[in-house]
Swiss-Prot record:
It comes from the Bacteria. The gene is smrB. This is Ribosome rescue factor SmrB. The keyword Nuclease applies. GO terms for molecular function: RNA endonuclease activity; rRNA binding. The lineage of its organism: Bacteria, Pseudomonadati, Pseudomonadota, Gammaproteobacteria, Alteromonadales. SMART domains: SMR. One of its GO terms (biological process) is rescue of stalled ribosome. Keywords: Endonuclease, Hydrolase, Nuclease, RNA-binding, rRNA-binding. NCBIfam families: PRK04946.1. Acts as a ribosome collision sensor. Detects stalled/collided disomes (pairs of ribosomes where the leading ribosome is stalled and a second ribosome has collided with it) and endonucleolytically cleaves mRNA at the 5' boundary of the stalled ribosome. Stalled/collided disomes form a new interface (primarily via the 30S subunits) that binds SmrB. Cleaved mRNA becomes available for tmRNA ligation, leading to ribosomal subunit dissociation and rescue of stalled ribosomes. It holds the Pfam family Smr. SUPFAM superfamilies: SMR domain-like (SSF160443).
Length: 176
């Protein structure tokens, strides 16, 4: 090829495209939407739930009698106070109708809310029977580092279908 062929080729190309208008830009460039506060909180809850709760961990919990557990280093009097109903729960979580994965997220969110609101005691209603949640909730609670103790709730807070949970909220004085 020589320069004359290039000039002829360019001239023919120019003649062919003469009168053609360029296409107007019709593509929109969308920004990725910013995450809402709810989405961020949900992601954070999932992260907390996944890091604290394992479905395979089997703690040593009582088989007979009321469901109860006390963390090491916590006075046994606290468990007695929970049993008698001396602690009034400030927050209540009803897990009826929840799937296991949803219940795990809600439980993590409840514990986080208790710490945030400086609420030392909460009530978790898992329901009657021998269902999955009734078995899993105590196992999850044992694994969370902020849970100091839990006991089957007194009748006024749900009895066999609920647990009163004592949360470690830091160095705040105990509030009953």
């Amino acid at each position: 090829m020589n320069k004359n062929d290039d000039k002829e080729g360019m001239a023919m190309f120019s003649a062919l495209i003469e009168g053609i208008k360029p296409i107007a830009q019709d593509k929109r460039h969308f920004r990725t939407p910013l995450k809402t506060k709810q989405e961020i909180e949900l992601k954070e809850q999932q992260l907390h739930a996944d890091s604290y709760f394992s479905d395979t961990y089997q703690p040593l919990l009582p088989v007979q009698g009321p469901m109860r557990w006390l963390d090491e280093g916590v006075d046994s009097l606290e468990l007695k106070r929970l049993r008698r109903g001396d602690y009034q729960p400030d927050l209540l979580l009803d897990l009826h109708g929840y799937r296991q994965s949803e219940a795990k997220l809600e439980l993590a969110a409840l514990i986080q809310a208790c710490v945030k609101q400086q609420s030392q005691c909460c009530c978790v209603m898992h329901g009657y029977g021998t269902g999955i949640l009734k078995q899993q909730v105590p196992m999850w609670l044992v694994q969370h580092p902020k849970v100091k103790a839990f006991h089957q709730a007194p009748k006024e807070w749900g009895g066999d279908a609920a647990l009163l949970v004592l949360i470690d909220i830091g160095d705040q004085p105990h509030r009953r």
